[in-house]
Design a protein with these regions (language model features):
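Alpha-helical transmembrane segments
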Residues: 191-208, 272-276
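Alpha-helical transmembrane segments and their helix-start/interface "positive-inside/aromatic belt" motifs
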Residues: 1-10, 80-100, 203-214, 269
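Hydrophobic transmembrane alpha-helix segments characteristic of membrane transport
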Residues: 58-94, 186-200
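Loop-to-transmembrane-helix entry motif
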Residues: 47-54, 90-94, 171-174, 181, ...
Length: 279
């Protein structure tokens, strides 16, 4: 472990990146029930239960509105095929509200299985670690006092960029987890729209959107795996006869570009899912 301040600063930024990358892998394999000890999940299920009663009320409202919209007269409603169709729709919508939590949990478990399979097949458990090459360390340690001033500025800028990218990436993954909680909490309201034929599109969009949020985990896992393979070889040092400032600047520039590729892929996971699946 080098005692050089510049080396320590760069290592600290890289450690932050590695920690956030490892945290992403943990979050992707964690269920909402176990996240942060399950306290958020308990609050979410409580809200879901409270909104279920409102969902039943809206169920009747959407059902009645659907009957009025689809049946031109009371005579149409008395037809057996119309009455049976309306009854089946009402029963299915009621069941969806009653077992909505179980249905959403099952959908999440299916996608979680996809994520676990992707990770297991890749053979990676923590996304790999980015380390400062020994050649860079030697170059930095050989720098004199005056030459270290511009090197200090370059290192500070690079460390700041790496740290900011680390937090942007992890915030995106945390945002996905929070969206899962919000979808689960509010679920009875949009699900109740299945009771009416004119309003069922709201429920369909809700299910598709929730499936898209779940699938974001698979896209993020793929992005991390591809990045780990892509960045397995550290940025090339280039001409070792160059000054330490130039070498470090080139190294940080290429490293930040690689990190930007991953951050961009992670942040675009929702858009990628929509383009792939139309969700």
């Amino acid at each position: 472990m080098s005692d050089n301040w510049i080396v320590q600063n760069l290592n600290s930024a890289l450690n932050t990146w590695n920690e956030k990358l490892a945290e992403i892998w943990t979050l992707l394999t964690q269920s909402p029930e176990s996240f942060k000890g399950g306290d958020i999940w308990n609050v979410t299920t409580g809200i879901n239960g409270a909104l279920t009663a409102i969902g039943y009320g809206l169920l009747v409202l959407f059902f009645a509105a659907g009957i009025v919209k689809t049946c031109g007269s009371f005579t149409d409603m008395k037809k057996p095929e119309h009455a049976l169709k309306a009854f089946i729709r009402f029963a299915l919508a009621q069941g969806a509200i009653m077992y909505g939590m179980e249905l959403m949990t099952a959908l999440f478990s299916i996608v979680q299985g996809i994520v676990s399979t992707i990770m297991a097949q890749s053979g990676m458990t923590n996304g790999g670690a980015t380390e400062l090459p020994a050649e860079i360390v030697e170059k930095i340690e050989a720098v004199g006092m005056l030459e270290s001033i511009p090197l200090w500025i370059v290192t500070l800028l690079g460390s700041l960029l790496i740290t900011v990218l680390s937090f942007i990436m992890i915030l995106t993954v945390y945002g996905r987890m929070f969206k899962l909680y919000m979808y689960t909490a509010i679920a009875p309201i949009p699900i109740s729209t299945f009771a009416g034929e004119p309003s069922q599109s709201v429920g369909k969009n809700f299910i598709k959107s929730y499936a898209g949020v779940c699938l974001e985990g698979a896209i993020i896992a793929l992005a991390c795996i591809i990045f780990s393979v892509y960045s397995a070889s550290p940025p090339a040092i280039g001409d070792t006869s160059l000054s330490a400032v130039t070498i470090v600047w080139n190294y940080i520039g290429e490293l930040v570009f690689n990190l930007l590729v991953l951050v961009g892929a992670v942040k675009a996971s929702d858009r990628i899912v929509k383009e792939m699946m139309g969700l």
